[in-house]
């Protein structure tokens, strides 16, 4: 009996599989290099414990540190709210000097300051911010915006939370918002 011939189509799978794997690794590598984060695909925010949380309600500022009542509640609620985002690209709006001055006098905003950078694990370079500003009431409020900053400067290109409700619920429970 003559030797069995292998069907030719089976030999095509291996080069196609190697080619597809190479393309996949190349795409992963490009995104990892551009985002400066090899775990960009996780899509979960690594939120370090804040040094301080500042809540500003109509110009009145409340400073919370790790031993303050309500600190843990706000931190956990912020972790939940920042667990997913509506889009994977930052929006183009930023915080003008006028908006920041308005936040000093009216509305409700939440600011968090960290000693370690926040890592959003996104497929672009998130800048590794050490401060977050979340408008709750007033300009830019009600849209789930999260502004990032570092070194006393706020950056253009806010992220949009998918569900800010845990944060709103915590602020209401602590008396910073009215139902």
Roles of regions detected by a PLM:
Residues 2-179:
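Function-determining sites in protein domains
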């Amino acid at each position: 009996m003559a030797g069995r011939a292998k069907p030719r189509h089976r030999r095509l799978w291996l080069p196609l599989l190697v080619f597809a794997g190479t393309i996949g690794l190349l795409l992963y590598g490009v995104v990892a290099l551009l985002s400066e984060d090899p775990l960009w695909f996780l899509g979960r925010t690594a939120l370090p414990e804040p040094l301080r949380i500042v809540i500003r309600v109509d110009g009145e500022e409340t400073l919370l540190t790790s031993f303050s009542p309500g600190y843990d509640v706000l931190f956990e609620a912020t972790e939940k709210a920042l667990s997913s985002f509506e889009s994977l690209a930052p929006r183009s709006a930023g915080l003008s000097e006028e908006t920041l001055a308005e936040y000093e006098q009216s509305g409700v905003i939440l600011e968090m300051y960290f000693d370690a950078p926040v890592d959003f694990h996104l497929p672009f370079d998130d800048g590794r911010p050490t401060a977050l500003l979340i408008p709750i009431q007033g300009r830019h409020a009600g849209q789930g915006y999260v502004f990032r900053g570092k070194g006393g400067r706020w950056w253009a290109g806010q992220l949009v939370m998918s569900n800010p409700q845990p944060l709103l619920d915590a602020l209401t429970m602590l008396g910073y918002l009215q139902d």
